[in-house]
Amino acid sequence: MQIRQSVKFKKPLIHYITNPISINDCANMILAVGAKPIMAEHPLEVSEITSISESLGINLGNITDNKMKSMLISGKISYEKKIPQVIDLVGVGCSKLRLDYAKKFILECHPNVIKGNMSEMKAIYGIKSSAKGIDVGACDIITEQNFDENIEMIKRLSMETGSVVAATGVVDIISNGTYTYIISNGCEMLSMITGTGCMLTGIIASYISSGNILEGTALAIVLMGICGELSQHVKGTGSFRNELIDNIFSISDDIIIKKIRINSY
């Protein structure tokens, strides 16, 4: 929990290039964990913005030519200046443009964290996936039958890229190739409002600013899962969204420790 308190105390500046669908919620989620968001995306300014930031988030949702240029510029600056960065592989399972771009970004920018659902992870690893748009395909969902093989794939992807790999879903798998965590927190309603994955990437970017990449990533995923569970009593998805942000802001370390469901593998 030291990472949480450090972020709240230091209020790191997080540069997050994301999509217009979820940008407001992403900025508010970064604020909720105690960091400061800046969502600049113009190709002529992102180099300067990334350089003064303490972490970088890259989200491939709703990409445009300009954003593709900006993301690559920021990613390279982040790598050169050793600023922690996370890429969210939104849609690489259903779009060749995004898949090819993601491979180029990973090769040239060396992100500290690669995040996505299992369909996106299979696509980036070169395995046929069954993505349903930006959502995980039914055949790619982690089950008891494919649990071990999916963990091995995530570990291999981490070792090949040198990145912490975070595969999110009903069960979350986070690995740096040596240490692997399995997280079972969360609820169905997290998949019923748009942008929760994008919001999570903002939290990951905030927490890896501490330099603790594996632990910061795992903590962000645990936090989102537990706060989803705490928020699901509400009337519907609109109030769930608001309750989720409130719980991210107000949850205590004691509740996280009490409700966390995490195992090493």
Swiss-Prot record:
Tell whether Ion transport is among the UniProt keywords: no
Quote the record's binding site residues for ATP: 115, 168
Kinase: is it a keyword of this entry?
A: yes
Give residues annotated as binding substrate. Answer: 39, 195
Q: Name one Pfam family in it.
A: HK
Q: Which reaction does it catalyse?
A: 5-(2-hydroxyethyl)-4-methylthiazole + ATP = 4-methyl-5-(2-phosphooxyethyl)-thiazole + ADP + H(+)
Q: Which cofactor does it need?
A: Mg(2+)
Judged by the first EC level, this protein's enzyme class is: transferase
GO BP terms, alphabetized: thiamine biosynthetic process; thiamine diphosphate biosynthetic process
UniProt pathway: Cofactor biosynthesis; thiamine diphosphate biosynthesis; 4-methyl-5-(2-phosphoethyl)-thiazole from 5-(2-hydroxyethyl)-4-methylthiazole: step 1/1
Gene Ontology MF terms in the entry = ATP binding; hydroxyethylthiazole kinase activity; magnesium ion binding
Q: Show the NCBIfam families listed in the entry.
A: PRK09355.1
Identify the HAMAP family for this entry.
Answer: Thz_kinase
Name of the molecule in the record: Hydroxyethylthiazole kinase 2
